[in-house]
Amino acid sequence: MSSNKIIIANWKQNGSLRTLQSLTSQIIKALKLKSISHSVVLLPPYVYLPILAKKVTSAKTLRNLSIGVQNVSAFSDGAYTGEVSFEMCKDFR
């Protein structure tokens, strides 16, 4: 029985933009150099998502690398301070 493993890098509240850009570049480079069959998903803090998503999508040859969000609110809208809805996250596509 074969299983496709998923490696998820949830960076939580760690790292500056510069640090996470560098780390993302290093991951892209490593995936290009090594034959890794596992899927890799990067989950940066929301404030860096647009910048790092652009970096990930520019690495078009890497079909096993993707980017996502760390948390989605249970509510679709409303006065929920700090929450991010699924609809808002879809705008990052």
Where are these regions (language model features)?
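Conserved N-terminal beta1-alpha1 strand-loop-helix module at the mouth
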Residues: 1-84
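Non-catalytic positions within long, well-ordered alpha-helices that form the structural scaffold/packing
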Residues: 82, 90-93
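Surface-exposed charge patches
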Residues: 87
